């Protein structure tokens, strides 16, 4: 069995509307760049290989995006893999979003900056198009999800779904992505969100997204008991903006609420200890006949 490994990715979330809810986000995954991602490392990269930097703007606009892009170019040059290609894809895309805005600004004291920004925008746009074309045939799940989310590429979506049925992932990001693809099938959404929760580490942002998604899915099913249960799990795990008033008009007795809160404590502890599994969840639910 092939297992896709977690390559230390952070997230950029782009929200879309699904019929299951208007709360579950689609994700475009972008890389957390490695050792050379700090400013000092980028300076060294540029000193040693100016070709990685010279077509980019050097003013303060988009500095973080610029540094990430330079690091991604460097990492790809050092070791060209699908993961470094993916990192460059997302870094180029993020830089493009920033530099397009900067290119519209008319600097008062240094008008030449606009020319440089426009040049950087065009250069990186061409680079992005070329890399997107190059990776169209890839079966890397991160790249497939990129093409689906960014360009609504149905073929990429179908291949991503096919891979998820045959292979296991060990990154919750990928299960979250699959859950969003299954937006109209609440049962499959829940299955994949639970798989993602099983893999959670110390990532508050991912924890929030997965649990929000699970609460939303259970609410969509009108399974208010489990929506209430996971709302309390979220509170225990310090997820913000959990609204328990959603349950004031639903038929959950106070006795049942108390039992669910006890179960929530057990589940939250399992998640913290990275011991939450599908089997442990089923066992907890069966103990109270849920």
Identify the function of each model-found stretch:
Residues 190-191, 225-228, 242-245, 257-261, ...:
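Conserved positions within tetratricopeptide repeat
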Residues 140-220:
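Alpha-helical adaptor scaffolds
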Residues 4-24:
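Bacterial N-terminal signal peptides that target proteins for export
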Residues 222-240, 265-272:
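TPR/TPR-like (Sel1-like) alpha-helical repeat modules
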Residues 171-174, 201-210, 236-248, 275-278:
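Boundary/linker segments of alpha-helical solenoid repeat arrays
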Residues 40-143:
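N-terminal Sec/ER secretory leader and immediately downstream segment
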Residues 246-290:
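Terminal, low-structured helical/coil segments at or just beyond the last alpha-helical repeat
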Residues 32-35:
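C-terminal motif of bacterial Sec signal peptides marking the signal peptidase cleavage site
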């Amino acid at each position: 069995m092939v297992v896709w490994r977690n390559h230390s990715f952070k997230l950029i979330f782009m929200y879309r509307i699904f019929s299951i809810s208007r709360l579950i986000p689609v994700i475009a995954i972008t890389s957390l760049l490695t050792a050379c991602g700090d400013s000092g490392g980028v300076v060294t990269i540029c000193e040693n290989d100016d070709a990685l930097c010279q077509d980019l703007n050097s003013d303060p606009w988009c500095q973080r995006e610029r540094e990430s892009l330079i690091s991604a170019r460097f990492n790809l040059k050092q070791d060209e893999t699908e993961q470094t290609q993916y990192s460059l894809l997302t870094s180029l895309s993020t830089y493009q979003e920033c530099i397009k805005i900067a290119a519209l600004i008319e600097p008062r004291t240094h008008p030449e900056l606009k020319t440089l920004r426009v040049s950087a925008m065009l250069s990186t746009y061409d680079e992005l198009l070329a890399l997107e074309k190059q990776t169209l045939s890839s079966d890397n799940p991160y790249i497939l999800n990129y093409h689906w989310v960014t360009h609504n590429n149905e073929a990429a979506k179908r291949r991503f779904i096919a891979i998820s049925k045959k292979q296991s992932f060990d990154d919750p990001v990928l299960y979250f992505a699959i859950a969003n693809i299954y937006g109209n099938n609440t049962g499959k959404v829940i299955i994949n969100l639970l798989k993602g929760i099983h893999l959670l580490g110390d990532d508050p942002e991912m924890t929030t997204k997965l649990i929000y998604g699970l609460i939303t899915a259970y609410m969509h099913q009108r399974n208010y008991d489990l929506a209430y249960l996971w709302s309390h799990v979220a509170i225990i795990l310090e997820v913000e903006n959990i609204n328990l008033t959603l349950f004031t008009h639903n038929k959950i007795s106070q006795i049942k609420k108390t039992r669910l809160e006890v179960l929530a404590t057990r589940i939250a502890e399992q998640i913290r200890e990275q011991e939450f599994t599908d089997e442990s969840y089923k066992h907890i639910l069966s103990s109270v006949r849920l």
